[in-house]
Amino acid sequence: INDPDKYVVVQTAPAVRAALGEEFGYEMGTNVEGKMAAALRRIGFDKVFDTNFAADLTIMEEATELVERVTKGGKLPMITSCSPGWIKYCEHYFPDMTENLSSCKSPMQMFGATAKTYYAEKMGIDPKDMVVVAVMPCTAKKFEIGRDDQNAAGVPDVDISITTRELARLIKRCGIKFDTLADEQFDQPLGIGTGAAVIFGATGGVMEAALRTAVKMITGSEAGDINFTDVRGVAGIKEASYKVGDLDVKVAVASGTANAAELLKKVQNGEADYTFIETMGCP
């Protein structure tokens, strides 16, 4: 941040704004998005962006890939790829199923790739001089940014990943009085997002957002008459079947690697025939 030759931007995951307030005496779950954006500017970031922007990109890409696999005979079931802890687990314990993983990057990495290609070009900034910092609820994100395949612009998509608690410590270390800050907005254009992006952070949210988008792509109409509540909630494994146009789509959502492993073993043994599986490494 103090290097005048670096253009430093920050992105924040949707879960962070609902957890950060606890570090400053707010009730659990309080949305402190506005104060968080203000604090990040006081720290010295050049731009303050929202990972929800990239979550929407991920949803569109993942839904497109799902529709293509279903209609053109691609590898099924397709498995979500936004959880780095799950990806690493799959690579180690289910290497024969890595082709089932979606080709989409996680929202964090997709944001970094967009920032260092599209946004850097628009701003006239060399990607090598841009530093992308991500504030995430997941420590596995620190591993994800170092993967060899996460460098769309020839440099790491994301340079630094910190947790919600680490951000809180940084705010306190900078002497910022969090509760006195006036609410501020994210910067544009990488600071906008939809409700679909917000639910991305909850188990079942990726599935619901992608399915709603896929319904629109296949039928040309909104999914208003399709109830996706079966994939929500805190159960370790959730299953549901939906009629999407002329297609029968069977889906499953696994919370935690133990439940994900149970699902994949069923697929390997021919005991289950899913179209789409969402997995999150965290329980």
What is the predicted function of each stretch?
Residues 1-283:
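Iron-sulfur-associated redox domains of electron-transfer enzymes in respiratory
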